[in-house]
Amino acid sequence: MSRNRIRTAVLATATITALTLTGCGGKQDRTSDTAATGASGGANDCTASAGQITIATGNSTGVYYALGGGLAQVISANTELKATAAETGASVQNIQQLVDKKYDIAFSLADTAADAVTGKGAFEGKTADVKALARIYSNYTQVVVSKKSGITKVEDFKGKRISTGSPKSGTEVIANRLIQAAGLDPAKDVSAQRLDLTKTVDAMKDGSIDGLVWSGGLPTGGITDLMTAMKDDVQFVDITPLLPKLKDVNPVYAEDVIPAATYGTPADAKTVVVPNVLLVRSDMSDANACALTKLIFDKKADLEKVHPAAKDLDPATAKESDPVELHPGSKKALDDLG
């Protein structure tokens, strides 16, 4: 992500509420209708069927929630499908509830999705029958600590109160992997607080926790709030020394920087990134998967108005979802897009 794009983030983020309210249905618990699986023409069709479709997103102050609401609006406005987006705990929970047919589309970190299809981590012993619509933008692992905590590296988490994200979230997955890579036991060495982002930010402000791990796009509204409120009292932690150990677990992890302009910090912050993917069940019709995938890229400009992370949507990298297989309908759409 370029620095110039980051500098426009605050203005772009200001449009989130206006563009997503009609698409966000709050927390939901429903059984998926036939829209996701229903046929819509022949094998070469790329037209969505009529019906209802729901999208599992993430915490209300995170990028999944913002883009999920925008995606729901785009789907409803341009197809016969009526889409809603729901606030959730994010990646692990999203995949579990996608498989249980409570949602039809799910945002997920690529490392969590890889665990799901290979039966590892939270999915030990039971693989999830899901496919990818596309690889989308990348999540930045944002480790923020109070300066008075004395934390300068993940090894310093020992004995500290650290928010590791919502239960069953992708943030919790990578937080625990970071702690383990630092030679610590998440259950014994760290006072892990399993908080959503809103509660995490509040806890940082009132001093009831020493630091946080968050995995999200740039900028994340909750982190912007924290940095604006606490300014020089907080700082990012460089986690890149742990990257080799993380890559031993999953090669999807890579190094990048959080540009200083993102949150108004004194300097760029080195960190670890992981791609995001949009997932569906394998039983989604080829026509629906094709139509939805094509729509994401055709309406990229509309999604950019919701959140600048959508600027990273690229058909050239969208197929890179291994080990999660692309849905056949999505493959057709991406082949057509070139």
What are these regions (language model features)?
Residues 34-56:
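N-terminal low-complexity, Pro/Thr/Ser-rich intrinsically disordered segments
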Residues 67-74, 84-126, 143, 151, ...:
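Pocket-flanking alpha-helical
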Residues 110-112, 119-123, 149, 186-278:
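Pocket-lining segment of extracytoplasmic ligand-binding domains
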Residues 269-271, 275-338:
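Segments of small-molecule ligand-sensing domains
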